[in-house]
From Swiss-Prot:
Record GO cellular component, one term: cytoplasm
Protein name: Small proline-rich protein 2F
Subcellular location as annotated: Cytoplasm
Top-level taxon in the UniProt lineage: Eukaryota
Tissue: Expressed in uterus.
Organism: Mus musculus (Mouse)
Main location: cytoplasm
Record's keyword terms, sorted: Cytoplasm, Keratinization, Repeat
Lineage of origin: Eukaryota, Metazoa, Chordata, Craniata, Vertebrata
InterPro entries reported for this sequence: SPRR2
Sequence repeats: 21-29, 30-38, 39-47
Chain positions covered by the region annotation 3 X 9 AA approximate tandem repeats: 21-47
Induction comment: Up-regulated by estrogen in the uterus of ovariectomized animals, with strongly increased expression detected in luminal epithelial and stromal cells at 6 and 12 hours after hormone injection.
Function description: Cross-linked envelope protein of keratinocytes. It is a keratinocyte protein that first appears in the cell cytosol, but ultimately becomes cross-linked to membrane proteins by transglutaminase. All that results in the formation of an insoluble envelope beneath the plasma membrane.
Protein family (similarity comment): Belongs to the cornifin (SPRR) family.
Length: 76
């Protein structure tokens, strides 16, 4: 009879294996917030950098005005 009681205790022990899966769930969210924020910063940084480069190209367009001054005298 003692053997049968031991056999019943063996199948009952498997239930404790269920609690471990609960640990991976709370661990997953903690690992996502850490690696998620760093990659988001490097991507948005390179985009805002190109706009300033375009502003520098705008000043060189001012030189054309002097050429227009030479054009009016020719029309005279």
């Amino acid at each position: 009879m003692s053997y049968q009681e031991q056999q019943c205790k063996q199948p009952c022990q498997p239930p404790p294996v269920c609690p471990p899966p609960k640990c991976p769930e709370p661990c997953s969210p903690s690992v996502c917030p850490e690696p998620c924020p760093p990659p988001k910063c490097p991507e948005p940084c390179p985009e805002p950098c190109p706009p300033p480069s375009f502003q520098q190209k705008c000043p060189p367009v001012q030189p054309p005005p002097p050429c227009q001054q030479k054009c009016p005298p020719k029309s005279k």
